[in-house]
Swiss-Prot record:
<keyword id="KW-0217">Developmental protein</keyword>
<keyword id="KW-0539">Nucleus</keyword>
<protein>
    <recommendedName>
        <fullName>Arf-GAP domain and FG repeat-containing protein 1</fullName>
    </recommendedName>
</protein>
<keyword id="KW-0862">Zinc</keyword>
<feature type="modified residue" description="Phosphoserine">
    <location>
        <position position="362"/>
    </location>
</feature>
<feature type="modified residue" description="Phosphoserine">
    <location>
        <position position="167"/>
    </location>
</feature>
<feature type="zinc finger region" description="C4-type">
    <location>
        <begin position="29"/>
        <end position="52"/>
    </location>
</feature>
<feature type="modified residue" description="Phosphothreonine">
    <location>
        <position position="177"/>
    </location>
</feature>
<keyword id="KW-0744">Spermatogenesis</keyword>
<keyword id="KW-0238">DNA-binding</keyword>
<dbReference type="GO" id="GO:0043025">
    <property type="term" value="C:neuronal cell body"/>
</dbReference>
<keyword id="KW-0863">Zinc-finger</keyword>
<dbReference type="GO" id="GO:0045109">
    <property type="term" value="P:intermediate filament organization"/>
</dbReference>
<dbReference type="InterPro" id="IPR001164">
    <property type="entry name" value="ArfGAP_dom"/>
</dbReference>
<dbReference type="Pfam" id="PF01412">
    <property type="entry name" value="ArfGap"/>
</dbReference>
<dbReference type="GO" id="GO:0007289">
    <property type="term" value="P:spermatid nucleus differentiation"/>
</dbReference>
<dbReference type="GO" id="GO:0008270">
    <property type="term" value="F:zinc ion binding"/>
</dbReference>
Length: 561
């Protein structure tokens, strides 16, 4: 009897609990508004879902949560739930909660749900005591009722057709063409002015219709075709970035001092040409002479027309030699540095004295070119040799000769050291070595271009007395007269050109005194296989005076023997 009565009592309580769950305000979870609560929060008397029941157990202090379908309730618990419920709990625990000002958390994030429950139950942020809960609830109800009444007092907007019915006559507006008032016309004019800047004004118009005419200033905006109408601007900017205009400039625009009408060019036939013809051959390497040396004469700034005529004569005489020998083209080197004794050929690196041009360059005969294949190189000695007195580049005198690097005085002694006079070897003229200069011809000497001794230097800048194909190892040469590079001929007379001064900063010492290792002299092999006297120094780094005169024509061709 007692068990059945107890069972009947539990069934009765369960039925009452299910009836309370079916109430409208209890159909959702009190904490997260999820439909179908399955647990009951016996601490506050609310109905919650499964996820919120776990969060409520983790609060401090933990809430007592019971399952609706898996537990039994006593009579006191049922009465407690009947007195509370979600509606009453909302008035107590969320009495001060404002839906518009307070942020509702995202209940899908468990961390945010836990923080919201702590604010609600632990901190009692929106808590209202039960005795004041009904008063606060009534105030909220009155406020919400007044707002609802104000909202309902606003008439509902309905279409005109629903008010007039289907039988309402059609209303036609602007059927005629009444005259417009001045106010309307002015407003339309203002609208047309604003229409140009209104991006949304043409949305309702026909996209295929012809556009309205615009003003001239607007039509010409960003119209690049109108740039051609400015004649003055085009004429001013016609030559902008036009590199062809540089070809019409004067001789000063020729970069690097390329020859113009007043300068001697690389080819004699272009001497009298215009600047345009010279620019046409610019970077055309076929127009350069077949020579391995650079044309320093083109950098001259005070070259006279007499030099140009001399160049033309030399090129005319070279026509026969070019057919006779393949190296005849090297004869143009004579046109660079020589134009006669005391010539007016200027230098780009200094000021030269002016004197009338003397004799014309003498060209070797055709017989010498035919007898020796290297005879065409005869004019190479005219670059570095002279029949007149040797001159120094930096010693001022009354008469001036030509020089490449500065003022060239004539007739002055190049060095204060003594120089011995004697016949030049192989009939060669006095030396034009830019590193060794002397007042007169001397006997045979070493061909080292860097050696400074007391003998008159006869070696040219690049070894005038050496052979073109040196026979320094005892091989007899096949030619009779050794010259600067090759060939057998008599060197023509030209003014000496000493380009660099003699260095006298170090005292000259006897042979072998400066370095003990190189103190011994070595036998010098002559171009004809003969050993010269022991007094000739063959060390290129020693400075000393010879012990005696050497036989004519006995000079070393190997600077390291």
């Amino acid at each position: 009897m007692a068990a059945s009565a107890k069972r009947k009592q539990e069934e009765k309580h369960l039925k009452m609990l299910r009836d309370m769950t079916g109430l409208p305000h209890n159909r959702k979870c009190f904490d997260c508004d999820q439909r179908g609560p399955t647990y009951v929060n016996m601490t506050v008397g609310s109905f919650v879902c499964t996820s919120c029941s776990g969060s409520l157990r983790g609060l401090n202090p933990p809430h007592r949560v019971k399952s609706i379908s898996m537990t039994t309730f006593t009579q006191q618990e049922i009465e407690f739930l009947q007195k509370h419920g979600n509606e009453v709990c909302k008035q107590i625990w969320l009495g001060l909660f404002d839906d518009r000002s307070s942020a509702i958390p995202d209940f899908r994030d468990p961390q945010k749900v836990k923080e919201f429950l702590q604010e609600k139950y632990e901190k009692k942020r929106w808590y209202v005591p039960p005795e004041q809960a009904k008063v606060v609830a009534s105030v909220h109800a009155s406020i919400s009722g007044s707002s609802a009444s104000s909202t309902s007092s606003t008439p509902e907007v309905k279409p005109l057709k629903s008010l007039l019915g289907e039988s309402a006559p059609a209303l036609h507006l602007n059927k005629g063409t009444p005259s417009q008032s001045p106010v309307v016309g002015r407003s339309q004019g203002q609208q047309q002015e604003k229409k140009q800047f209104d991006l949304l004004s043409d949305l309702g118009s026909d996209i295929f219709a012809a556009p309205a005419p615009q003003s001239t200033a607007t039509a010409n905006f960003a119209n690049f075709a109108h740039f051609n109408s400015h004649a003055a601007q085009n004429s001013a900017n016609a030559d902008f970035a036009n590199f062809d205009a540089f070809g019409q400039s004067s001789g000063s625009s020729n970069f690097g001092g390329f020859p113009t009408a007043s300068h001697s060019s690389f080819q004699p036939q272009t001497t009298g040409g215009s600047a345009g013809s010279v620019n046409a051959n610019f970077a055309h390497f076929d127009n350069f002479p077949k020579s391995s040396s650079a044309d320093f004469g083109t950098f001259s700034t005070s070259q006279s027309h007499q030099t140009a005529s001399t160049v033309s004569k030399v090129s005319t005489n070279k026509a026969g030699l070019q057919t006779a020998d393949k190296y005849a083209a090297l004869a143009n080197l004579d046109n660079i540095f020589s134009a006669g004794q005391g010539g007016d050929q200027g230098s780009g690196f200094g000021t030269t004295g002016k004197a009338p041009v003397g004799s014309v360059v003498s060209v070797p005969s055709h017989s010498s070119a035919s007898s020796d294949k290297y005879a065409a190189l005869a004019e190479l000695d005219s670059v570095f040799s002279s029949a007149a007195t040797s001159s120094n580049a930096y010693t001022p005198t009354s008469n001036a000769s030509s020089s490449v690097f500065g003022t060239v005085p004539v007739g002055a002694s190049a060095q204060t050291q003594p120089a011995s006079s004697g016949p030049a070897p192989f009939g060669a003229t006095p030396s034009t070595n830019p590193f060794v200069a002397a007042t007169g011809p001397s006997a045979a000497s070493s061909t080292n271009p860097f050696q400074t001794n007391a003998r008159g230097a006869t070696a040219a800048t690049f070894g005038t007395a050496s052979m073109s194909m040196p026979a320094g190892f005892g091989t007899p040469a096949q030619y009779s007269l050794p010259t600067s590079f090759s060939g057998s001929f008599q060197q023509p007379a030209f003014p000496a050109q000493a380009a660099f001064p003699q260095q006298t900063a170090f005292s000259q010492q006897p042979n072998g005194a400066g370095f003990a290792t190189f103190g011994q002299t070595k036998p010098v092999v002559t171009p004809f296989g003969q050993v010269a006297a022991a007094g000739v120094s063959s060390n290129p780094f020693m400075t000393g005076a010879p012990t005696g005169q050497l036989p004519t024509g006995s000079s070393s061709t190997n600077p390291f023997l």
